Amino acid sequence: MALIRVKNLLLRTFIGFNPEELANKQDVVINIEIEADIPEEALLADEPVGIYNYKTITKQVIELVQDNRFKLLEVLTKNILDLIMLDERVCHARVEVDKPHALRFAESVSFEMEAKR
């Protein structure tokens, strides 16, 4: 079992339902934790065949986030989690999405979800 983390992935998307949020992209910061089954042979071979490719899933997350609009932080988080869980090798995943400056006196607001098989 391996634990893969993608930390502080900074992306821009349409997130929210207020008029200003509907008109302008905003920053979101995404943290992903993936527990995946990686065969021992793949680790011993030191080759990319058979491993969980974090670059591939990161590109998919980027595409999902940047190419869509979301009213709710919760829906964005769930969509990312569902995308990650499509890979059968993933045993457990956790996704946290921060929306910086969502509240006047707070650095950010975040929503976190996890899924297990």
Name each model-derived stretch:
Residues 1-117:
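N-terminal, polar/charged subdomain of small-to-medium soluble alpha/beta proteins
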